[in-house]
Amino acid sequence: MVHVSDEEIQSYLSMRDERDRFEFYFSLLERGYRFAAQTHDIPVDEFLKLHQQFRDGGYKNERLFKKKMIRDYGIKVLLEHVLTQYAYHLRLTVTDLKGKYINSGYIYTTYPDDIFFNKNVRKLLVTDKTLMITDFIDKPQFECQLSDLAAGIIRSVCLDENTRKYIPNDDNKEEFAKMRWDEECNK
């Protein structure tokens, strides 16, 4: 077990810079790796390399979800998962067929917990006029008009009533605000 002293806890609670907090989390993980490696075969160096990659990437957790070429509209779309400590975003980027950037924007934002987003974002379907994101049971969740995307307009409609409850809005904005501890929470 990794011990965290009262002094470390107090120091953590006073941190306002997110990089300081990230480094605190990493320090705990790294202590845990080294402790576990005393009795188990743990690839500590590999974990440390992953931490460094995360640091080098600006502490961002982003990964490609899907990409699709839509020849009839002359575009390619990329959907990426973007997870921060404050929110999960589904980012849609549109390029022309040669890869020239057209526009990018978030089409879904929710709580930073995979319980909220993982089941809602599973498949990408293209119909004659729409780009649709479905959930794990193929129920439509979000829809974008292909004509909008081809014109560089990034917007979506949430098609699922339950999913809409977890998108920031006037009814839940205080819940989202409670998650922030950085300089944004003091404005």
Describe the function of each predicted region:
Residues 85-93, 139-145:
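Structural motif
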